[in-house]
Amino acid sequence: MIGIPGNLAILCAFTKAICQQNFTPSEIILGKLALANLLVILTRGVPLTLQAFGVRTMYDGLTCGITLYIYCVSRAMSIFLTSMLGCFQCLLIAPCPSRCLRLRHSILEKLPSIMISLWCFNLLVCCTRLFYSMPHTGTNCTEEELTVVYDFCCVVFPSHLLYFGNGAVFVTRDMFFLVLMTVSSGYLLFVFRQHGNLMKRLPMLQMKHSEIRAAKSVMGLLAMYLLSFGLDSVFWMVNLCVSPVSLRFADARMFFDSCYSAISPMLIILTNRKIQAGLKCAIGKR
């Protein structure tokens, strides 16, 4: 539940910055990332928390479908936005910015189109959650063969082709962004090492402190992403290959899947001075 106030604080800070025309492309991506993480927590974390405290959440087929649909789309956008943030940060701290300037401007110009395209892609891919979701009370999900089990609902596919086809698309998409994150992380580590060596040899030569701080923040997000979503994807592939479905795998997926959306806002707040200043200002007014 700590992710809700954290993501709301990020959204409020960046919404204010956008209204004041005082924002950067990285902050736009961070704001959208906070929105995606907030939707993940509201559709996955809140029901689980209520269930842990003994509050029964009554779901029917419609509410299961809508909840899982919003969750899956938001989770996919969270992955995409994190990878985009890493790639954009690599362009910003490139040792030869003149060579990357044209690519950077091209990405900035196409950023809205890229966002819309990814939204449409994920809305289409995740539509199976709308059509085939049902509550646990409607069927014994653990005994069904072609089933993806969530904590309060499940998705029962009508055919092997749709089951494995949809799973393959999900795994391929997640693995693509995992590879992209790994490459971005490796490049950022390489730049940090090169910068450290240059600082030892030429103390007067240094990169802007704000760029280093922002890059380290993104590096932390990438590492958190690789840990949480990487393990989640592993459990997802096990879920596809194991029948009947084990609830332990579903619980493990839930835990690793929720870590990133809940903890990443704390890292963003601790490393972003604009958000810290906004929070101090709000507390001072009170």
Where on the chain are the PLM-derived regions?
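Transmembrane helical core of 7TM receptor-like proteins
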Residues: 1-286
